[in-house]
Amino acid sequence: GNLEAVDKKVRDGGKDYISDEKRTNVGSNLNAKDISLTSLGDIGITGSNIVATNKASIQAKGDISIVAGKDSVLHEEKHSKSKGFGRSSSEESVAYATRNVASNVIGDKVNITSEKDVNIFGSNVQANTEGQIRADGNITQAGVKDINYSYHKTTKKGFMGLTSKSVTDENYAEKAILSATLGGDKGLTYDSKNNLILSGVKVVSSGSINLKGKNVEINPLETNSYNKHKEVKRGFSGSFSPKGISVSYGKDKLESKTDILNQTASQIISNKDINIEATDKVKAKSVDIYAKNDVNISGDNGVEISTANNSYDNTTKQSSSRIGASVGINSAIVNTVENVKNIKELTDFSGNSYDILNNASKVVGAIKDGAKATIAVADTNYKGATDAGYDNLKIGKNIFTASVSYNKSESKSSVHNETVEKSSLVSGNNMNIKSKNGSINISGTDVKVGNDLDLSAKKDIVIKESEENYTSSGSSSQTGISLSANLEEGRIADLSVSQAGTRARGNGTNYINSTVNVGGKLKTNSENLTLSGANVEADKLDINAKNLVIESKQDKSERKDSSYGGSFSIDLVNPSSFSANINGSKGSGEKEWVNKQTSLIARNGGKVDTDSLTNIGAVIGSENEKEKLKVSANKVIVKDLEDKNKYENIGGGITIGTDVPNVSIKHDKIDKEQINRASAINTDFEISGKKTSAEELGFNTDIDKAQEITKDEEKHLDAELHTDLLGKDKQEELKKAGGI
């Protein structure tokens, strides 16, 4: 048994509070040459050690529970300060952590037997020679999780509450602690009359490992973590740039939350053989199984080897509302200086038609900026003259600008991503997977066999891909209003109002192929055999199935996005002088694309006997021209698989003023295509007893053309058409600038 020691200290000083609490597991330690624990009821071992130099025996008519104890630390702290004129600050923090203290059962020979259930949680069993765990009920062994949690919040307020800042961080993380069973040369045996469930375990033996039960389940250990960040500010901010100086006052808010899910694979490792037997089903998910010799897996009503997914989720929100003022230099002057600095890039007209049009638009824009800048610096209309003689020049009034503004913005983004925690099955010699009444399903798994692999099922054998899903979305909006002033004349000049926003979303699925690599012969026997998102390779093939389907899998995704914007400005002194701009864009795309074709390949030939063969964009055959793959079938279906990756975004804008409108256009286009040809390499066919060539059946026989990109186009246009140059006002502007 165990006890819990508690140590708690508190210091409370009103505005300063500190608390520390520590809880410690105090376990028992039992040491002897031979140890025998027996009970007519239950046996519970918590955070304790049972160590025998010879035999360790634990026997009970009731349940046997061998579980971890727990240490924990809790720290709480609060501080606050108050100053004059409404100024104050405060800080609050919490830290909490737990640590599991494993129970350990150690002996040269270890025997744990219950007439009910055996539960081993976060604890370890070590049998230096031989270990046995038996139960008439269930055997459950699982890892546990250490926890770390923290919370921290700071708040500051300035003069009369005009400025303030609050920052909150919260973090939580679980750490996987596997439960281990170690065995010596005579191996390890788990024998349950009901269910054997292993989750987050490491079972290792220099001898053989035997796992038996009605149902045998092997699972990963799932851990979660999250972090939250929240920040609220109220106050002043400023910036300096070549265009001027600005200062603003307002409120900014940021919130972000991230959730992470991790899968830690279980491990079954033997220096000899691994035997897994279930009278009902074997289910293994995200597991690593390795045997130096043979791996034998048998589930009378089915065998399932699959994966679990890690995931990442994040949601971020931002908002801001500010009142500001700025003083600066006319933007046309700043732009002209930048254009002169980048004149080499600006006049580069290489590339495709879209590139040339983009640069042409930039050049015309630079000329227009130059004209504005010239007029701003030197006004040629002085004294009514139309030329730029020295006596007629006047320093312009539009060099410096000033404005006051109100702006509000909001944005939100979210993302979800998954990654597969694959399973792996490895044997140095042979591997046998059988189901006498059911099916064999293998997904997202890497199988490697040194010698022969035998798959046998009464119903179906399916070797397929695993899925990784992702989604994303985002939106933003901005609203603004500003008043600009003429610094020289001391009056309000222009009123401007604007609004803009964006929206986007996307989702998709990526397929991660299973792989099977066999050093010797791959033999299968089933009603149906399906290879979907799988790459299977063996020295020789011996395939027997009524229906054989081999198909490649397409990654799929779609996306949609849009934007809008508009602005209106008017000269308050001369209301007939105004401008309005409206712009927007809309895009969408979809993708169906095979990353890697499904394949069934023999290095040195073999045979396939089937009633019906279906090949959809996959590759079958032999690497050896002299040792071909021989396929016997009554029916063959051959289909190529066509991929596409298409996206198009069309947008533009129009600016309306007192003269001819100015038009801009935006066009992005991606158009790609790929073909995955159903291919048969070095393969002889016999269809309904008649020899037939692969070409006659419609197969591609050139491995270099099995997967081929047939279209690859990408164009991007973002240009102003400068249609306003057709108007007299812009022509006069250029004429005036040209006369200086």
Label for each model-derived stretch:
Residues 1-740:
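Binding/recognition "hotspot" determinant
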